[in-house]
């Protein structure tokens, strides 16, 4: 089971938390859920250069708090805070009128061991026509500088423009997928190359 299931959802309530934290009445649940999706879609689409790894949405009554985990906070804040003001205005338009919005930016101090950012890095390398083995090796070397116990990276598709799609993976160290108390970070990404879409999966064991 641990080999197939998403490692993050498998560990919810043990050492992982939901990315949205709120309660709602049944009649308003779907509307709030759709708001959350609109917020995430807007931020990930319009702040591609900001290297955002996680968006945490907390709600309490009409208070909405966004926590943006990013390795490049300056891109979001902008010059003299113009970027964050613009973001606040645009996100507020996606919320109901009575909602009060607060945005907190949390700096990701070590992006090399963040699965989302590492998967995005590999995708960017593949899109710029770097060979998949070189892209994966570069990502592993960056992660290993932080002395993590293990990392696994898998890429699937028409690798290096091959006629037949295949799956390749490389693992360094231990990645215990079935140990529930293991602190595993996991992310997926897609690289849109001229030969087709290449899927990227990253598992990082942090201890």
UniProtKB/Swiss-Prot annotation:
Cellular compartments annotated: Plastid, Chloroplast
Domain KH type-2: residue ranges: 39-109
Classification via InterPro entries: KH_dom-like_a/b, KH_dom_type_2, KH_sf_prok-type, Ribosomal_S3_C_sf, Ribosomal_uS3_bac-typ, Ribosomal_uS3_C, Ribosomal_uS3_CS
Coarse class of the protein's main subcellular location: plastid
An example Gene Ontology CC term for this record: chloroplast
SUPFAM superfamilies listed in its UniProt record: Prokaryotic type KH domain (KH-domain type II), Ribosomal protein S3 C-terminal domain
Keyword Ribonucleoprotein: yes
GO molecular function annotations of the record: rRNA binding; structural constituent of ribosome
GO BP: translation
Entry keywords, A to Z: Chloroplast, Plastid, Ribonucleoprotein, Ribosomal protein, RNA-binding, rRNA-binding
Oligomeric form and interacting partners: Part of the 30S ribosomal subunit.
Family (UniProt): Belongs to the universal ribosomal protein uS3 family.
Protein name as catalogued: Small ribosomal subunit protein uS3c
Organism the protein comes from: Cyanidium caldarium
Native organism taxonomy: Eukaryota, Rhodophyta, Bangiophyceae, Cyanidiales, Cyanidiaceae
């Amino acid at each position: 089971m641990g080999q197939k299931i998403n490692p993050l959802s498998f560990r919810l309530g043990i050492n992982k938390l939901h990315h949205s934290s709120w309660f709602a009445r049944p009649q308003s649940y779907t509307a709030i859920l759709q708001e959350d999706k609109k917020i995430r879609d807007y931020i990930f689409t319009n702040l591609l250069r900001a290297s955002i790894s996680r968006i945490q949405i907390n709600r309490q009554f009409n208070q909405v708090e966004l926590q943006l985990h990013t390795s490049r906070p300056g891109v979001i804040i902008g010059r003299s805070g113009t970027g964050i003001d613009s973001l606040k205005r645009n996100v507020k338009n996606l919320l109901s009128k009575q909602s009060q919005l607060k945005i907190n930016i949390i700096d990701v101090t070590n992006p090399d061991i963040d699965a989302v950012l590492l998967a995005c890095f590999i995708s960017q390398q593949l899109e710029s026509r770097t060979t998949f083995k070189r892209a994966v090796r570069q990502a592993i070397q960056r992660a290993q500088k932080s002395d993590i116990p293990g990392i696994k990276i898998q890429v699937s598709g028409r690798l290096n423009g091959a006629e037949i799609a295949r799956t390749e993976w490389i693992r360094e160290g231990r990645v215990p997928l079935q140990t529930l108390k293991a602190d595993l970070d996991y992310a997926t990404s897609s690289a849109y190359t001229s030969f087709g879409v290449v899927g990227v999966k990253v598992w990082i064991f942090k201890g």
